[in-house]
């Protein structure tokens, strides 16, 4: 079963909170609320990157797969994200590190129409599988 939900937004800081709320509603609707925390963390980082670095309108897409959720963020900036070495005293640069920690896999690729697609897949068990 594959379900999906999409949000298109302007590059405003409010879009990060709007995206978090979408994750919460969607994960509950999909009976996957046990995975809400890692999916929310990844969405917040990828959307914040789109808002801060791309500064273009973006599209967030959540896709439910068998036991996982795929997060996709498309924007119009061609620069791909980089996983940097974590610097303990740095004020930034932790976004993709967090994505790398939470996701079973992630990547970024140029979009055919320009810009890029950044994606992450997160293993998530349905609530019934965890409870029983």
Predicted regions, residues:
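Conserved beta-strand-loop-beta-strand hairpin that lines the nucleotide-binding pocket
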Residues: 1-6, 51-132
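STAS-typified acidic loop motif
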Residues: 6-20
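Pocket-edge positions in alpha/beta enzyme catalytic cores
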Residues: 8-11, 31, 91
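Short, functional N-terminal and low-complexity linear motifs
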Residues: 9, 25-28, 38, 64-69
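Conserved short strand/loop->alpha-helix "switch" segment adjacent to the catalytic nucleotide/phosphoryl-transfer site
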Residues: 17-44
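Short active-site loops of ABC-family nucleotide-binding domains
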Residues: 48
């Amino acid at each position: 079963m594959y379900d999906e939900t999409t949000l298109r937004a302007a590059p405003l800081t409010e879009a990060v909170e709007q995206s978090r709320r979408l994750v919460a509603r969607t994960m509950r609707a999909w009976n996957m609320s046990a995975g809400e925390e890692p999916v929310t963390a990844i969405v917040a980082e990828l959307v914040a990157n789109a808002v801060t670095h791309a500064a273009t309108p973006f599209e967030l897409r959540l896709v439910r797969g068998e036991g996982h959720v795929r997060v996709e963020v498309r924007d119009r900036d061609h620069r791909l994200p980089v996983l940097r070495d974590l610097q303990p005293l740095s004020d930034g640069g932790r976004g993709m590190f967090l994505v790398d920690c939470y996701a079973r896999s992630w990547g970024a690729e140029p979009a055919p129409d320009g810009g890029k697609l950044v994606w992450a897949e997160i293993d998530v068990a349905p609530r019934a599988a965890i409870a029983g």
